Curated annotation (Swiss-Prot):
Cofactor, free-text remark: Binds 3 [4Fe-4S] clusters.
Cofactor section: [4Fe-4S] cluster
GO biological process: electron transport chain
Domain 4Fe-4S ferredoxin-type: start-end pairs: 101-130, 131-160
Key words, A-Z: 4Fe-4S, Cell inner membrane, Cell membrane, Electron transport, Iron, Iron-sulfur, Membrane, Metal-binding, Repeat, Translocase, Transport
Record's function text: Part of a membrane-bound complex that couples electron transfer with translocation of ions across the membrane.
Protein name (Swiss-Prot/TrEMBL): Ion-translocating oxidoreductase complex subunit B
Species for this entry: Magnetococcus marinus (strain ATCC BAA-1437 / JCM 17883 / MC-1)
Phylogenetic placement of the source organism: Bacteria, Pseudomonadati, Pseudomonadota, Alphaproteobacteria, Magnetococcales
UniProt-annotated stretches for the region Hydrophobic: 1-26
Gene giving rise to this polypeptide: rnfB
Oligomer and partners: The complex is composed of six subunits: RnfA, RnfB, RnfC, RnfD, RnfE and RnfG.
Length: 181
């Protein structure tokens, strides 16, 4: 019994010592993050797809603070770009795409290899091995990571069809608008 108590006490002491060491190291080597970069990263879709030319959303947020264009996030689209512009106090830039798109799988050509399912960062593709797959349109972020691994090229990017639920009124001109003067 005494051996068990001494073993527990020694392990507890080592754990306490390691915890104190880690706590000290966390305080000693703490690096202050740029709050603007953190806010930008929160606005980005976090798919880390690399379509902007950076290895993920964090490096792209850092690049924006260093002067990179704010309109390179294809999955985020116009809404994310406008949010970034509003946060930084700059004018929105034109998006160089034709609008939002989602992946479409030709289910007759799909062989059910699951390669697309494995690379989708948001789990927007459903299906089983050796069964045809389909895309959950509401979840697809248009990152296009599913296109390359598909051995049958049965995945294409299709424009998001407009419907009555997505339609919105144009914002009216405000009292300070040049359109009224």
């Amino acid at each position: 019994m005494l051996e068990a108590v001494s073993a527990v006490m020694s392990l507890g002491g080592m754990a306490l010592f390691a915890g104190l060491g880690l706590g000290y190291a966390a305080k000693k080597f703490h690096v202050e993050a740029d709050p603007v970069v953190e806010k930008l990263e929160a606005l980005l879709p976090a798919t880390n797809c690399g379509m902007c030319g950076h290895p993920g959303c964090g490096p792209y947020a850092q690049a924006i603070t260093e002067g990179e264009a704010i309109n390179l996030c294809t999955p985020g689209g116009k809404a994310v770009m406008e949010s970034i512009a509003a946060m930084l106090g700059v004018s929105p830039a034109a998006m160089d795409d034709e609008g939002p798109k989602v992946a479409y799988i030709d289910e007759e050509a799909c062989i059910g290899c699951t390669a697309c399912i494995k690379v989708c960062p948001v789990d927007a593709i459903v299906g089983a091995n050796k069964q045809s797959h389909t895309v959950i349109v509401a979840e697809c972020t248009s990152c296009q990571l599913c296109l390359e691994p598909c051995p049958t090229d049965c995945i294409t990017m299709q424009p998001v069809p407009e419907n009555i639920y997505d339609w919105t009124w144009d914002k009216p001109a405000g009292p300070n608008s040049k359109a009224l003067h």
